[in-house]
Amino acid sequence: MMACRTLCLVVVMVASLGTSGVGGRSVEGASRMEKLLSSSNSPSSTPLGFLSQDHSVNKRQVFDQACKGVYDRNLFKKLDRVCEDCYNLYRKPFVATTCRENCYSNWVFRQCLDDLLLSDVIDEYVSNVQMVGK
């Protein structure tokens, strides 16, 4: 009897979460990210562009050698973590690669900050991008 009540309670909770619009932010964020990435003219930002490149995926270096600013491993890790988390949110390889382009100085990185709810510390991240940038 107790197991039946617990099961019914779980079913009711799951059903109410499904109809409450809990997943709305992800859908909204995904459509904004798709629109942002489709407006970019970079070949790596096309949804299937990564398939035309080498299929094996190597672990990305912590820092980008094209970035000519201050070399600070912790700073690069912090910026790279935003792109990794954004990739984990959308599970699209082109999100991670486009996020890192131009030493993190791009609109996808900014959108990732917003989608990861980091807008309250955006000034700190902008400052970090300027430090490592070109």
Swiss-Prot record:
How this protein is processed and modified after translation, per its record?
A: Stereoinversion of L-Phe (form CHH-A-I) to D-Phe (form CHH-A-II).
For the modification D-phenylalanine, the affected residues are: 63
Residues modified as Valine amide are: 132
The cellular location(s) given in this protein's UniProt record come to: Secreted
Report keywords, A-Z: Amidation, Carbohydrate metabolism, Cleavage on pair of basic residues, D-amino acid, Disulfide bond, Glucose metabolism, Hormone, Neuropeptide, Pyrrolidone carboxylic acid, Secreted, Signal
Tissue note: Produced by the medulla terminalis X-organ in the eyestalks and transported to the sinus gland where they are stored and released. Present also in the ventral nervous system.
Q: List the disulfide bonds.
A: 67-103, 83-99, 86-112
Cross-referenced PROSITE patterns: CHH_MIH_GIH (PS01250)
Q: Which GO terms describe its biological process?
A: circadian rhythm; glucose metabolic process; neuropeptide signaling pathway
The record's annotation in Gene3D superfamilies points to: Crustacean CHH/MIH/GIH neurohormone
What GO MF annotations does this protein's record show? Answer: neuropeptide hormone activity
- One Pfam family, please name it: Crust_neurohorm
Tell me the leader sequence span: 1-24
Q: Does the record's keyword annotation contain Membrane?
A: no
What residues bear Pyrrolidone carboxylic acid in this entry?
A: 61
GO CC annotations, alphabetized: extracellular region
The UniProt record lists the keyword Secreted: yes
| Similarity comment | Belongs to the arthropod CHH/MIH/GIH/VIH hormone family.
Q: Briefly state the protein's biological role.
A: CHH is the most abundant hormone in the sinus gland of isopods and decapods which controls the blood sugar level. Has a secretagogue action over the amylase released from the midgut gland. May act as a stress hormone.
PANTHER family in alphabetical order: ION TRANSPORT PEPTIDE, ISOFORM C
> This chain belongs to which protein, by name?
Crustacean hyperglycemic hormones isoform A
Q: Which organism is it from?
A: Homarus americanus (American lobster)
